[in-house]
Amino acid sequence: MEYDYIIIGAGSAGNVLATRLTEESDVSVLLLEAGGPDYRLDFRTQMPAALAFPLQGKRYNWAYETDPEPHMNNRRMECGRGKGLGGSSLINGMCYIRGNAMDFDNWATMPGLEDWSYLDCLPYFRKAETRDVGSNDYHGATGPVSVATPKMGNNELFHAMVEAGVQAGYPRTDDLNGYQQEGFGPMDRTVTPKGRRASTARGYLDQAKGRKNLTIVTHALTDKILFEGKRAVGVAYFKGESPQTVQARREVLLCAGAIASPQILQRSGVGPKDLLQGLDIPVVHDLPGVGENLQDHLEMYLQYACKEPVSLYPALQWFNQPKIGAEWLFSGTGIGASNQFEAGGFIRSRDEFAWPNIQYHFLPVAINYNGSNAVKEHGFQAHVGSMRSLSRGRVQVRSKDAREHPSILFNYMSTEQDWQEFRDAIRITREIMAQPALDKYRGREISPGLEVQTDEELDEFIRTHAETAFHPSCSCKMGEDEMAVVDGQGRVHGMEGLRVVDASIMPQIITGNLNATTIMIAEKIADRIRRRQPLPRSRARYYVSGNTPVRKAPLKPAS
């Protein structure tokens, strides 16, 4: 079989490309996905409050593990990635955060990326979005991605935690994706008006899958990209145990994510020559940056008992769950219709940072992100972590076998800045939690526990308990330097007919969750592939901190 375009990976980027490219009826597209369909009757992926469930199995999760992380007590750490139509948008936490404007302005200072400034990217964020309260200079109202804003009457702990952040001297913002990201405020989520997860399978593929020029093949595990010289001409994949090959007339578009995209390139002969030769993989093109520059967000949970019976603890008890499930199933409302990350914020921990370097997610229950280690009492917590770590990792293929997971090392916490930021984050969080807005609710500190105070004690807590935020990125970075893998249009350097379009091409990780930005990247490059003029540059105003102090005097100073 032959198609104009072959897309590898039906995730946050691949589904965007499949939908946009097939808007032209004379273009044929094959979309290959290693996982299965996004079963709409499976509450594990469709109910926002059930977000922990897909991470606990392997039906929707590749369930990668890192190599022993040398600065984290040699722990092998989780690296969950989505498997199935929707990719990681099928199993993520549904937080709709775009990053800070300064992230993109910083990208645009890099050679070859001049058109990736915030005002160049903002029109594509708007194009992708339908926000439930309508459009403005920052938000769209006609896009495929349903974005829900928090509503009146949601859990009172959200409001108390935001107010505590403001009382601690930090800014308030009414829109973390609007004029000013810096500060504490409500958090948008990718949830439909009917209370369902708004994955890219639902938002994009639902409108495209009936087109005659789009072919979707699930349970299709990519083996390698096929080349004639330096030109990509097709893909070899397995449908179950059966090997298949397909040809691409125009381009192969690799959208397999920050772990699998470099793995597939390397297995296909595009990557660091020494690595490939050591595995007896024929070298098609020596490209040393493939799999390098790997970045992620690391986070911790600071947990508190709640003196008032207002947390979500009762929802964790099995005898309350049938009622919650029924309300969600038949009405699309209630606890089940929210991911329960409805407030958070971004702050600068020190004046040396020009834009926020710490992110908060507030949660009105005390539990790990993957659903483990729930505290058996009313509680609440802050997820807190640094945003732009200087630590760099790598992804390396282990063999020619498409079924073997790659070697992954994030090299977490490898710089002194990492340790300083995380110590600061714990101490700042404790100061926030001590503010009067939380006096009514705040019980004892469950984790880390008040006995953990010195730098050495904090460091050991971090080494033992910090976890991934599931934001791998930057492993096929765009740019023009010697370690860049693609140019500003996603085209692989030194190759023809081959692009990478996903979170792996970010040159530096953004300040926030990755899904919204990955969708934006795909929307922007889709116009390039179609040889369309870019959308007109936005003229929206946006906040730059300049010489503004990190914070005002707190209402209640640290004791």
Curated annotation (Swiss-Prot):
GO molecular function: betaine-aldehyde dehydrogenase (NAD+) activity; choline dehydrogenase activity; flavin adenine dinucleotide binding
Function, as annotated: Involved in the biosynthesis of the osmoprotectant glycine betaine. Catalyzes the oxidation of choline to betaine aldehyde and betaine aldehyde to glycine betaine at the same rate.
Organism for this UniProt entry: Pectobacterium carotovorum subsp. carotovorum (strain PC1)
Reported cofactor(s): FAD
Region Disordered, annotated ranges: 182-201
Protein name, per record: Oxygen-dependent choline dehydrogenase
Enzyme nomenclature, EC number: 1.1.99.1, 1.2.1.8
Residues forming coiled coils: none
Active site per UniProt: 471
One Pfam short name: GMC_oxred_N
Record keywords: FAD, Flavoprotein, NAD, Oxidoreductase
Species lineage: Bacteria, Pseudomonadati, Pseudomonadota, Gammaproteobacteria, Enterobacterales
Binding locations of FAD: 4-33
Record's catalysed reaction(s): choline + A = betaine aldehyde + AH2; betaine aldehyde + NAD(+) + H2O = glycine betaine + NADH + 2 H(+)
Entry annotated with the keyword Secreted: no
Family stated for the protein in its record: Belongs to the GMC oxidoreductase family.
Pathway: Amine and polyamine biosynthesis; betaine biosynthesis via choline pathway; betaine aldehyde from choline (cytochrome c reductase route): step 1/1
Top EC class for this record: oxidoreductase
InterPro entries, per the entry: BetA, FAD/NAD-bd_sf, GMC_OxRdtase, GMC_OxRdtase_N, GMC_OxRtase_C
GO BP terms: glycine betaine biosynthetic process from choline
Assigned GO CC terms: membrane
